[in-house]
Amino acid sequence: MRRSSGMTIAWAALVLVLFSQGAYPARAPAIDGDAIDGDAMIAEYFEIETTRLRDACLAEITSLEDWEAKRSEYRRQLLEMLGLDPLPERTDLQAVVTGQTEHDEFVVERLHFQSSPGLYVTGNLYLPRSRSEPLPAILYVCGHGASRRDGISFGNKATYQHHGAWFARHGFVCLTIDTLQMGEIEGIHHGTYRYDMWWWLNRGYTPAGVEAWNCVRALDYLQSRPEVDPDRLGVTGRSGGGVYSWWIAAIDERITAAVPVAGITDLENHVVDGCVEGHCDCMYMVNTYQWDYPLVAAPVAPRPLLLSNTDRDSIFPLDGVVRTYEQVLRVYELYDQRNNLGLQITAGPHRDTQELHIHAFRWMNQHLRDDDSMIEKAAFKFFEPQQLKVFATLPEDQKNTEIHETFVPAAPEPPVPLDDPQWSTMRDGWLQALREKSFRAWPADPPDLAFEVVGSAVRDGVRFAAYDFDSQQAIRLRMYMVQPDGPNLPQRIVVHVLDDPALTEMLAAYQVAFAEQLSGETLPEADAEAYRVQVEALVAAQQAHVYIAPRGIGRTAWDPSPRKQVQHQRRFYLLGQTLDGMRVWDVRRAIQAVRAADGLPDVPIHLHGAGTMAGIALYASLFEPRIAQLDLGDLPADHRHGPYLLNVNRYLDMPQAVAMAAQHSRIVLQDADPQDWSYAKNVIDALGWEPEALQFRQ
């Protein structure tokens, strides 16, 4: 439709700049040929985001009253981030002692229990032979020390047996339990680290939650034993066991003393310094609430807590350990319990050293037995691993190897709403969950877009222009606009959300005529036929086409090696983000940039994407107004295949997102099975929306 002459003149002047804040010069400069250093960009971004979380950690706590008012909510948040809110049902442990292993000073019971039905925990219970009253008990949680022979796993309890033996020889009951991955039944810790199970992020699942729950039930078991004083329970463990010591001490106040060894450092070490690359998934909660790690430790206060580490530990570096200690010390000082917090640093690398043993033993003696005597006996391994094995044959009903499928349940398919009020309640609940649980890390106060025109040219009747804008601090992106040359407004603006293959196709076509404007891109072989087809279609339809590659694609790509790709995605995760979730934000900012140009707010916008980018476009449309149409190719039918958004499957899945989008946008699904989208179609029919709101094309 033709506009008034005044609007047409304004459009003719401004369409050439589209996103600039002033008039476009008569001759646009060529794009600077220097490409963005994607590695430097993402490193700066991670540092900025890490600093933001560090500065927020415990910043609101200035008094004991502040802390006490928030402590229970912090505990609830941690439980949620471990997948334990609500807590699983405390079912019958079905504990079984399968045998005993003898020593002159103690007996080892080889046992198993089920923390949940079918989730087996194998362990060794070390009992002093000499006992006349209930004794203090230690839960010893093991690190990543596999014990395996001829394809048979004896569990990491065999590797760490010397700790249980020492405690039993000194008046403690000690339960040493296997971990999920390195137990006699070998489950999975390395879901994202090794097996590309990025859907764990959608589910809000982490194996840290399984380890924490197993610890809770291990305390239940210890308290059921007549040999144990239920009010004197300690926890310790090293490396992975140090991490699990933090989980259980923070969430379960039955722990009266804790010594996590080599089990904590801060986000600066993990994200900026790269320690994440040496850790598996069991080390991390799903950081929905964007904590730094001192907040994991602080809930232990004011109970006796010893942070123990070596000075040359490469995956728990000394500087981060000390920073964590200093933050936690603030909370202990609020309680006037400075003496209940200790920091032990010994010489050495990431290794189970005798120096680390001694202080842990003394700490437990002091706080659980009121015994300040010197340590006279060292910790020794007395048994061969097979002597500590629990199962002769592994149970057929075990769920350990697949527990990641069920531990955090996905939301069931919801009912089709009966009326508009019911639908509004459902939709608003999903949107709130997305804002608070999936996209919480989006900038609350985003920076100015800082539009900049970086190149423009007219050839073959079309104008091609390049623009840079800020998605958020440190993330500067480039978008390209192609449109028929002339004064008229476009009939619509088609925003293409590009993955690597789609970007390659676009570059191959448009470099035929606009290679100079594409400098800074890695250009493929030119495709003259594709260029001809694109130009003819664009001119015939009188459309403007905008191409946006979100962060990490094209000019902003970082190290393409598989390892670095995995570890950068894990960095996002540690910051309470996902790469896909922040790409949704990038698309939102691109849409805002288009809308910001004079004369464009009322021009219909269509979003195009394929595969995961179709899902990213879909979610962007839920938070940006007036998206006329979504053209989505190969949209994943569920989130298991992307996009990966924190916690999303705890609340909804792709069909519900499509239903929400269909309320305000026409959706065209390319190459889709209509049966996969029956929920969205049923919502449309039930609420009397336009039948064309959801269309299928092959």
Where are the predicted features?
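Bacterial N-terminal signal peptides that target proteins for export
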Residues: 1-11
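Alpha/beta-hydrolase
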Residues: 139-142, 177-179, 261, 495-498, ...
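A conserved hydrophobic secondary-structure block that centers on an alpha-helix together
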Residues: 114-179, 201, 208, 229, ...
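Primarily recognizes the serine-hydrolase "nucleophile elbow" in alpha/beta-hydrolase
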Residues: 217-289, 590-663
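Alpha/beta-hydrolase active-site loop
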Residues: 188-226, 554-598, 619
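Conserved alpha/beta-hydrolase
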Residues: 166-184, 539-557
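Bacterial N-terminal signal peptides
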Residues: 10-21
